[in-house]
């Protein structure tokens, strides 16, 4: 998979997972796709991309540490709500269905959690982890809502 549109900090995270953590290329690619979607959502939600922009067309190349430093738990909850209610399951389907499965949403939460843990604990680029207080019971409660 081509990570050329990913900011350096995300590429560093992906390399860390593949080389140090020993995750498969498929797992690392999935982390990239999940985090790319999250960052695109944040740019749209913060008004940093035109409201008319398709989520899949928003560039994340300009995402930097200051952008990530501003991430809040509330934004993560908004992203989870988007996944649960508004994200199209199969974009090419004749009649689109909305809302990703609980397992897809859980995987995205795991990717976000891992990314911010990396930024705070391993890379030491952030002092505080904005998703640290997103405990598993909270995530299950959010994921269970439809």
Functional labels for PLM-detected ranges:
Residues 1-2, 68:
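An acidic intrinsically disordered interaction segment
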Residues 11-26, 36-144:
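N-terminal core-binding DNA-recognition domain of tyrosine recombinases/integrases
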Residues 2-4, 143-145:
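A short, ordered amphipathic alpha-helix with a cationic face
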Residues 3-10, 28:
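Onset of an N-terminal alpha helix
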């Amino acid at each position: 998979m081509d990570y050329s549109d990913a900011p350096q900090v995300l590429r560093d995270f992906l390399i860390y997972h593949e080389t140090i953590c020993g995750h498969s290329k498929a797992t690392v690619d999935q982390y990239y796709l999940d985090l790319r979607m999250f960052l695109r959502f944040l740019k749209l939600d913060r008004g940093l991309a035109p409201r008319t922009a398709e989520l899949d067309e928003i560039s994340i190349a300009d995402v930097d540490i200051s952008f990530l430093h501003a991430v809040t738990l509330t934004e993560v909850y908004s992203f989870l709500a988007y996944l649960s209610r508004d994200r199209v399951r199969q974009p090419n389907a004749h009649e689109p269905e909305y809302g990703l499965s609980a397992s897809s949403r859980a995987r995205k939460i795991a990717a976000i959690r891992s990314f911010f843990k990396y930024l705070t604990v391993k890379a030491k680029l952030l002092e505080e982890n904005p998703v640290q207080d997103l405990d598993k019971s909270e995530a299950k409660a959010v994921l269970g809502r439809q």
